[in-house]
Amino acid sequence: MTSATIPGLDTAPTNHQKLLSWLEEVAELTHPAQVVFADGSDEEWQQLTERLVAAGTFKKLNDEKHPNSYLALSDPSDVARVESRTFICSEREIDAGPTNNWMDPAEMRSTMTELYRGCMRGRTMWVVPFCMGPPGAEDPKLGVEITDSEYVVASMKVMTRMGTSALEKIGDDGFFVKALHSVGAPLQPGQQDMPWPCNETKYITHFPETREIWSYGSGYGGNALLGKKCYSLRIASAMAHDEGWLAEHMLILKLISPENKAYYFAAAFPSACGKTNLAMLQPTIPGWRAETLGDDIAWMRFGKDGRLYAVNPEFGFFGVAPGTNWKSNPNAMRTIAAGNTVFTNVALTDDNDVWWEGLEGEPAHLIDWKGNDWYAGKTETPAAHSNSRYCTPMSQCPILAPEWDDPRGVPISVILFGARRKTTVPLVTQARNWQHGVFMGATMGSEQTAAAEGKVGTVRRDPMAMLPFMGYHVGDYFQHWIDLGKHSDESNLPKVFFVNWFRRGEGGKFLWPGFGENSRVLKWIVDRIEHKAGGQDTLIGIVPTATDLDLDGLDISSDDVAKALAVDPAEWRNELPLIEEWFEFVGDKLPSGMQDEFEALKQRLAKED
């Protein structure tokens, strides 16, 4: 099969020679039945969803409950990011570092080329041009994903600015990231397709120097929507290192005081630590308002005024469904309720609506995420998968900040790090300076969640919530953070804080109510920036006392507040060998600044003896 005999290649709506030659090369390798350029139109979405319903991949939901929305149930083997099959194939192994899987790029290209050979037989090869972030940006980051999955094309319309407008932005000679994806399930003539095609063999591979992504075998979001973690974190972090900016696993939140002054927060939390809930916060303190600019990824660059400005490169929310409800995140529920949403691996109700654990009103009967009957009180397994998702347009969020599409971004006042820890880490701590803040982020540990493979509940170090997403050596990444702090005067840099909403008391009870009440912690942070609030200088940084927090109207015991804020030297002594082990794992590239901060912590602890 040659490119000349593949329908659609000869009518490509572009004169970009490098793009055209790449498309021909991939088509000749993968043997698709046809090539289609995604234009991103609503008509195309309609055709895609109809095709997906006919294939059994999508089920149309009740339009009265969720208009223009669909449910997809994946293969049970294809439900999450596969970190064990995710590779950073830098030219030199040392540049991938100890946190990434590495293979020689030539060897990986050879292996995957053989997997791709004929892999799109019987399928459509979709060409999906996309733009990460507002297209009016000074330096827009563009990409083209080739995929044989209509599920991916439909989801990319929600998650990115894709289609004809992005192709026009690339122009005749613009740079773009090459993102190649296949589910790895070729169809022979007359062969019946699966509702969720995938392959037991999976590779999610990144070539940082050439800015390429090759993905094979998985149809699941993080492995297949290549604009998401693959581009906007792994490849973009390598770009950011080379170009002097930051690509981070962070929400962007706008908090507005009663005086109508806006403060912008960028916050890094590992999966299932309340990132989306905080991004769509409903403050409980009178007079305070919050708006969202993003729930997952922030790209941050220094402006001419020396401040750090953030944009969200995404166009939609790809949120974890279980636990999302009208109490924990009413704004996410309103966003979803507006429709145009793709749900994956949640349960189906008898009236064609969706349900998941944590939603109010458990139905007596459901079809679970595996397609089986599920009965309340009888079926022992969860109805929705723990990593089930909603994919929904950002533009529908009722508290979307007007600046969400501003190519200049917003000036960040606060960088928040957070994690899920039952003990040790207080509710909120302020870093002493930028380098100390980097140390806080570099040493964060969080309990394992369902969003990635691995044992749930064990604590793993997850620096800046970027452990699975750094596109280069973790030691160089820490040094990059330290170096960026020297780009500007300390007074212009965001102030760094660390939060832990998840500390527990006796009997495993959460000490802090969380959700909207977290606005009380953010108010203290704002007051610290404005030099209006007190705090205690502790072993680990500045921590408020109970009287420093605005607790008016909150039903919480003073004992619980004190325990939530406590800094226990014995617990921190237990943490020292864990930090030491982590730094030894980072190896020779650990910056001296991080070792200095660790020694300072040890010395402060020694004085407590």
From Swiss-Prot:
CDD domains: PEPCK_GTP (cd00819). It is an enzyme of class 4 (lyase). InterPro entries: PEP_carboxykin_GTP_CS (IPR018091), PEP_carboxykinase_C (IPR013035), PEP_carboxykinase_GTP (IPR008209), PEP_carboxykinase_GTP_C (IPR035077), PEP_carboxykinase_GTP_N (IPR035078), PEP_carboxykinase_N (IPR008210). Binds 1 Mn(2+) ion per subunit. Mn(2+) binds at residues 229, 249, 296. It comes from the Bacteria. This is Phosphoenolpyruvate carboxykinase [GTP]. It comes from Mycobacterium leprae (strain TN).
